[in-house]
Amino acid sequence: MPKDASGPPRSLLVLGGTSAIGLATARRLIARGARLVHLAARPSPALEKAAGELTALGAEVRTVPFDALDPESHQASLGPVFAAGDVDLVLLRFGIAGDQARDESRPLDAVRVAQTNYTGAVGAGLLCGAALQEQGHGTLVVLSSAAGVRARRADFIYGSSKAGLDAFAQGLGDALYGTGVRVMVVRPGTVLDPGTPRGDARLTTTPGQVAAAIELGLRRGSETVWVPGGLRLVMSAVRGLPRPLFRRLVV
């Protein structure tokens, strides 16, 4: 795959290759000219189905066995992807929401949320950042969450894992500044599945809307993307609330 340091990405690696946001983004980028897609996830029928759907859109799709919870395997899984040719875009999308009520009483389940969303992402993010720097160009898109801006009582386990991921991604972006590699942090609100009641439009979004925002952010060269855009102002206000008031606020 030839180097394409500017313009729409022609080759991409999706970490979380069965995620709705990852696949929606891949579909949009294929429509804009992407020709090679690596889908990285645990082997499953869902992964093969996703690969088939993207292949039908005209892309060459390669599946990559990847387990976020096994960082010692990341080099063996992802190294060959970069060795095979330049990757213009890496989308780091894997993660789990967990179940707050259950996880509070089952600490090992809470640890699994943290390990998947944060430590797994640290290992994969550093590996991909170094590989992009080695090739001299590329963009790493990291899916954070508005939940990481200020963890709520209702989801502080998940929120704290995303807070760590967000801080890591920002720091990695600073570390890679000037190398030809860019890190873009995406902070969606609550992502709704098809058929789910929408609720407050300032706080919710869909996989398709997140994908569209990612595409726009890539074109603009953005470092941070909020989805929906108005969420930035909402969360800025939430961040500054005194704790006694924040405890009573349902957001």
Swiss-Prot record:
Classification via InterPro entries: NAD(P)-bd_dom_sf, Sc_DH/Rdtase_CS, SDR_fam
One Gene Ontology biological process: antibiotic biosynthetic process
Annotated NADP(+) binding sites: 14-37
Binding site for substrate: S145
One function term, GO molecular function aspect: oxidoreductase activity
Disulfide-bond pairs as recorded: none
SUPFAM superfamilies, alphabetized: NAD(P)-binding Rossmann-fold domains
Assigned EC number: 1.-.-.-
Pfam short name (any one): adh_short
List of catalytic residues: Y158
Record family assignment: Belongs to the short-chain dehydrogenases/reductases (SDR) family.
Function (record text): May be involved in the biosynthesis of a heptaene-type antibiotic.
The protein, known as: Uncharacterized oxidoreductase in mprA 5'region
Organism: Streptomyces coelicolor
Lineage, opening ranks: Bacteria, Bacillati, Actinomycetota, Actinomycetes, Kitasatosporales
